[in-house]
From Swiss-Prot:
Catalytic activity: L-alanine = D-alanine
Keywords associated with the record: Isomerase, Pyridoxal phosphate
Sequence similarity: Belongs to the alanine racemase family.
Binding sites annotated in the UniProt record for substrate: 138, 317
NCBIfam families: alr
Gene name of the record: alr
Full protein name: Alanine racemase
Lineage of the organism: Bacteria, Bacillati, Bacillota, Bacilli, Lactobacillales
Source species: Lactobacillus helveticus (strain DPC 4571)
Pathway annotation: Amino-acid biosynthesis; D-alanine biosynthesis; D-alanine from L-alanine: step 1/1
Enzyme Commission number: 5.1.1.1
Top-level taxon of origin: Bacteria
EC class (word): isomerase
Described function: Catalyzes the interconversion of L-alanine and D-alanine. May also act on other amino acids.
Amino acid sequence: MVPGYYRPAVVKVNLGAIRRNIKNEMQHLEPNQKMLAVVKANGYGHGAVEVAKVAEEEGAAGFCVAILDEALELRRADIVKPILVLGVVSPEYAPIAAVNNVSLTVPNLEWLKDAEKYLAKENLQLKIHLGIDSGMGRIGFNEDDEFVAANKFLENNNNFFIEGMFAHFASADSDDETYFKHQCEKFKHMKSLLTVKPKWIHVDNTAASIFHSGIKSDLVRFGIGIYGLNPSSNPSSPDLTSAIELEPALSFESELTHVKTIHKGDGVGYGSTFMAEEDTIIGTVPVGYADGWIRKYQGFKVKVGDEYCSIVGRICMDQFMVKMPKKMLVGTKVVIISNNPSDPNNIKAAADYVDTIHYEVACLLNDRLPRVYYEK
């Protein structure tokens, strides 16, 4: 989408908060442990390149992304440290990854064999991480025989450099550790089958790092924590206590573009789902579901000036309306999402309101909303 630079609606990102979150995690790492900063999905909506540069300054060993295009974006921005693509990349694109010094995830033996054909044609060597499905049910090796065969295939194979082996926890953010421990044991078992020697063995994500201890992992893939958000933040449940201080970095702000008084019997929005019962002051905000502010936020309270005001009527594609207790001027600041966790319109409150997680709220705020960076 085209960024709306001529519209008063922006996502603000405090790079100072990002920096402090990374520093806090770096101090929390075990001796000899390193950090990979996860900046997939445009840095969880915060801006991949800008976040990566801060992480690089603070000593991150490298980066994780979800798709090859995200890795190439970082390379174009002169990010030179290792980059791992966590998702499955089609084998035909393995040479592109190799040329750009990007590491790819190996999900199974078939992928290895297919990728080798493309790499051999161009006499290239690709850095790879062996993905293990220890219980996430997503991608990676989960059968002993296939994993053993993959190890044998890789022995003395010059088209691949085995940089890592990893898995992903499904429930490290839960206070019930039963399945978490099951995954640990599964990963430990698969590790015992290795005949090749990866440079890095890694299984820690943000939740595993800040809620658990004693996991032998060369790297921590620090994702949601970079952005100051607690990974245990599920709707209608209390957060687990983080071992490090987390400071939210993102806020979402706009302004009133129109203010009017409507009268008894007047409706607001498509379907007139709000009907005035008396004279009512309505303000219009130039943000809608096309920006990622979905229709389910009808009724949510945003801060207009110094007042918390309910969104009334259905949220439109490009605008929404609020009911105000007093007349305010066009241009009055509207804080849709606050980066202060004590405010009632913080990102967890926004996520809870629509029965989702704050990861999704941040990621949905799309490119039509310019990002404004500051350090405080």
